[in-house]
Amino acid sequence: MSRVIGIDLGTTNSCVAVMEGGEPVVIANAEGSRTTPSMIAFAESGERLVGQQAKRQAVTNPENTLYAIKRLIGRKFETEAVKKDIAISPFKIVKADNSDAWVEVRGQKYSPPEISAMVLQKMKKTAEDYLGEAVTDAVITVPAYFDDSQRQATKDAGKIAGLNVLRIINEPTAAALAYGLDKKKDEKIAVFDLGGGTFDVSILELGEGVFEVKSTNGDTFLGGEDFDQKIIDHIADEFKKDQGIDLRGDKMALQRLKEAGEKAKCELSTSLETDINLPFITADASGPKHLTMKLTRAKLESICAELIAKLEGPCRTALKDAGLSASDIDEVILVGGMTRMPIVQKKVQDIFGKLPNRGVNPDEVVAIGAAIQGGVLRGDVKDVLLLDVTPLSLGIETLGGVLTKLIDKNSTIPCRKSQVFSTAADNQPAVSIHVLQGEREMAADNKTLGNFELSGIPAAPRGVPQIEVTFDIDANGIVHVSAKDLGTGKEQSIRITASSGLSKEEVEKMVREAEAHAADDKKKRELIEAKNQADNLIYQTEKSLTEFGDKIDASEKQKIEEGVAALKKALEGSDADEIKKASDSLMQASHKLAEAVYAKTQGAGAEGGEQPHGEQEAGGAAKGEKVVDADFEEVKDDKK
């Protein structure tokens, strides 16, 4: 089995790790950073920028720079969460044909899995550059509270990126794996994971290589992006109060505010006060306007108080579902960059009654855990058993629009559960199975995962036919449902891809497009390399012509000059093959010139080598009294 990489596909940043010699190693990207911004930009030239390159140009290209796409993955356009994002995003979020939330850039529509796949391709390339071999197998992490359609969409993103996703693993569980791999004692831990866009808390029991998740809870729309937005709103409100101009209407200014807000938030984790300076942020009839203000840690904490308060509920629910109290928890592990905020750490301490453990790197621990899980699946890591859970209950709609649960939340996965139902009317020929996920009593209040029909039921009074519905959740947390008429043995099943997901055909089309784009990238790189080599060849040839042109025939010199002119003309175009051909022709024409350069160099070397020897001989014969070699030798002898 080939190498398995572990990828933490984050809302704000992503990270990749691999097992090396039995130890997980976080891999630095081409820019030398161990995390990569989960950002994609589409330049005017058609070039696609990923990661740090995309982030650097975001201020000047806000409408075509995509970030926090993970918050849209597997979501319908009409949901409240998406509407919130539409109100604050500089890029365009549109409704797809299947009612999903997609994005539109430069007139082209993209699904969130497609955009996420571009980030995954960058992580794949980072790993391949480090390992020196092709990589196809991966373990990808998702927030523990992701529902089925979000998990399926993440798996689709992996497939589009050219990865074989061996396992989808929950982020807090991955962090627990990284924390507890070398721990020998039994303990109960809470993993508090507050990232760029999502919040999860999981309660686990660790012991003898077994990692058992007891419960999980969270909010898939609460994270650093929301804290950033609070800061942006505060800065914009203060500026409006001061200057009477609302910066929210200017996308470029808004992007600058976002960067400044994020920077201020990070600085206030270690400082009590920070300055925000944004010169030339906007202009009016009186001239340009500059934004200068101070932000204190206390002010930041007060404007984010509402978000901090939201962190407590999921923690209390997770403890209750696990049948534990806060005092039963031995360690609290902090995961995600947002846990560096002092107010977040204080909140964790208040909830669990103990100082959180800060022994793991919150930005890298999830990718490390994913790499360890990859090692487990590959057989490199022995004696580790991971027992994860499904975050939400699963069931079907029954008479009266009620949700009848077949699998309760926090059930260990993989798992399988069956229940027998019957018809609601006499002589009913078919039953419609409406599959749902959620905790509410009424079907309409829960998330629809899919619908399918079991037909061909023989005529019978209501309540007589026996329909067995079976739910099967695999180790990725992805649901398969089947319905069987026990009387006839007729069966119908679906693998849930969510009512608003990508079809198999769409995924395959996107895979082909991603491969085509990779081929385009390769062509662009080859063209740049050919141009660089050609530029260098022209420079060296012209330099040599200036110095040694008089050492070759006029006809040879003319051939070379014609070759240089032809190569310069080829450089005006964008055909790598033409440039290579013209470069080869110039190199052929330059052979005589190269010989002249070589001969001159050799001649200079020979003269340089013989000169001291000649002087020494002459000196020895004619200028004996002036030679100091003997004196020098005597001095050396004295020193000895």
Curated annotation (Swiss-Prot):
UniProt-annotated stretches for the region Disordered: 600-640
InterPro entries named in the record: ATPase_NBD, Chaperone_DnaK, Heat_shock_70_CS, HSP70_C_sf, HSP70_peptide-bd_sf, Hsp_70_fam
GO-annotated molecular function: ATP binding; ATP-dependent protein folding chaperone; unfolded protein binding
Modified residues (Phosphothreonine): 198
Alphabetical keyword list: ATP-binding, Chaperone, Nucleotide-binding, Phosphoprotein, Stress response
Biased amino acid composition, Acidic residues: 630-640
PROSITE patterns given in the database record: HSP70_1, HSP70_2, HSP70_3
Coiled coil: none
Induction: By stress conditions e.g. heat shock.
Pfam family, one: HSP70
Domain of life: Bacteria
Recorded family membership: Belongs to the heat shock protein 70 family.
Functional description taken from the UniProt entry: Acts as a chaperone.
Full protein name: Chaperone protein DnaK
Species name: Citrifermentans bemidjiense (strain ATCC BAA-1014 / DSM 16622 / JCM 12645 / Bem)
